[in-house]
Amino acid sequence: EDFRTWLMGWHLEQYGKVLRRSIVEEVVQNACAIAQYVNKQTYKLGVRVSRVDDGSANPKELYYDLGDAVVHITRDGWEIVDDPPIVFKRYSHQEKQVRPDATSRKADIELLHKFVNIQSRNDWLLFLTFVISAFIPDFPKPLLLLTNSNGGGKTTIMKLTKQLVDPSVLDGIGKIYNCESIVRPASKHALLYFDNISYINQDISDTLCGVATGTSLVNRKMYTDLDD
């Protein structure tokens, strides 16, 4: 549908005329056929974070989508690139990320501590592990469970973490009705959080674990049931 809209907009801009729907459908069908049976070139599709699939368990190159450019990350450093080998899917809810400043002083992840209300050193290290893991694609993720009294800053911590990893105009999910209400949004976010959830059943628990670890069943649901 995005391609159809782009095609109609491009034709209107170039020729000042609106394409008939029948012509649009013919172009789309021809493009799909060429892509599948002639070109046959495939691209890895990422959502906010991705990697070049070199078959290794420890990726040597990571890519992070800023929304209008991409950060290429290696063990030697990072750079902003405009034409990465990764194709990122950008959803309407996503916001552009702040561009990192290569001229700033050496970053210190401990500076994040002054923005979050985590007192225990052990809890703080667990939180940092969660944040760092969110930037590693195709990797089993831990599930972060925040507990505190009312007004203890749980929602604030998750909103900050969401904006740090995967900025979005959407807030966290307040209700989980079924497994589908997890799988669908999880396929459109690099980081997803649930707010004020008091109970989950076994099926939902299993689905959450599947999303975190990337099981094949959950992945199949993501890519076959993605249309809203």
What spans do the regions from the language model cover?
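Short, intrinsically disordered, charge-balanced linker/junction segments flanking boundaries
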Residues: E1, K114, T224-D228
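Conserved Walker
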Residues: G172-S181, I197, T215-D228
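Conserved RecA-like P-loop NTPase ATPase core
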Residues: V131, T155, T161, Y193-D195, ...
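Conserved catalytic/switch belt of AAA+ P-loop NTPases
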Residues: K162, D166, S205-D227
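Charged, alpha-helix-enriched surfaces in structured cytosolic catalytic cores
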Residues: D2, S22, E26, N122, ...
